[in-house]
């Protein structure tokens, strides 16, 4: 699974400053609570690949970004 990482508390995606390689996005994507394999910055948001199907991605159906 792939998609934009989402903060489950706020419903907002993880933001990043510049499209391309991102140490921050890669680290967050690979964190235990996300479980992804590779993350990078795409359109000012962190995109994550290799996510388990159980990991939610943005947008959340039941929680719009505040």
From Swiss-Prot:
PROSITE patterns: LCN_CSAB. Pfam families: Toxin_3. Its main location: secreted. Keywords: Disulfide bond, Ion channel impairing toxin, Neurotoxin, Secreted, Toxin, Voltage-gated sodium channel impairing toxin. It is found in: Secreted. CDD domains: neurotoxins_LC_scorpion. One of its GO terms (cellular component) is extracellular region. Disulfide bonds join 12-65, 16-41, 25-46, 29-48. Residues 1-66 form the LCN-type CS-alpha/beta domain. One of its GO terms (biological process) is defense response. GO terms for molecular function: sodium channel inhibitor activity; toxin activity. Expressed by the venom gland. Belongs to the long (4 C-C) scorpion toxin superfamily. Sodium channel inhibitor family. Beta subfamily. Beta toxins bind voltage-independently at site-4 of sodium channels (Nav) and shift the voltage of activation toward more negative potentials thereby affecting sodium channel activation and promoting spontaneous and repetitive firing. Has the structural arrangement of an alpha-helix connected to antiparallel beta-sheets by disulfide bonds (CS-alpha/beta). This is Toxin CsEv4. It comes from Centruroides sculpturatus.
